[in-house]
């Protein structure tokens, strides 16, 4: 079992252990992706996130 989350009506995360909510919405993993020092595409990802204003402030 992994910790999962879905967004509540107020936009905040609601944590659960289920893969699907009772309303039928698929939940997302609450854990970050694995880090690899050999990541070849990190610069492109950061550039895209900066371009579309998706970086946390």
From Swiss-Prot:
Its subcellular locations are: Nucleus, Nucleolus
| Annotated keywords | Nucleus, Ribonucleoprotein, Ribosome biogenesis, rRNA processing
* GO molecular function annotation: snoRNA binding; telomerase RNA binding
Q: Which regions span the lipid bilayer?
A: none
What's a single GO CC term here? box H/ACA snoRNP complex
The answer to whether UniProt assigns keyword rRNA processing to this entry is yes
GO BP annotations of the record are: rRNA pseudouridine synthesis; snRNA pseudouridine synthesis
Q: What does this protein do?
A: Non-catalytic component of the H/ACA small nucleolar ribonucleoprotein (H/ACA snoRNP), which catalyzes pseudouridylation of rRNA and is required for ribosome biogenesis. This involves the isomerization of uridine such that the ribose is subsequently attached to C5, instead of the normal N1. Pseudouridine ('psi') residues may serve to stabilize the conformation of rRNAs. The H/ACA snoRNP complex also mediates pseudouridylation of other types of RNAs. The H/ACA snoRNP complex mediates pseudouridylation at position 93 in U2 snRNA.
Q: PANTHER family recorded for this chain?
A: H_ACA RIBONUCLEOPROTEIN COMPLEX SUBUNIT 3 (PTHR13305:SF0), RIBOSOME BIOGENESIS PROTEIN NOP10 (PTHR13305)
Subunit organization: Component of the small nucleolar ribonucleoprotein particles containing H/ACA-type snoRNAs (H/ACA snoRNPs).
Q: Which family does it belong to?
A: Belongs to the NOP10 family.
Q: What's the protein here called?
A: H/ACA ribonucleoprotein complex subunit NOP10
Q: Which organism is it from?
A: Eremothecium gossypii (strain ATCC 10895 / CBS 109.51 / FGSC 9923 / NRRL Y-1056) (Yeast)
Q: Which gene encodes it?
A: NOP10
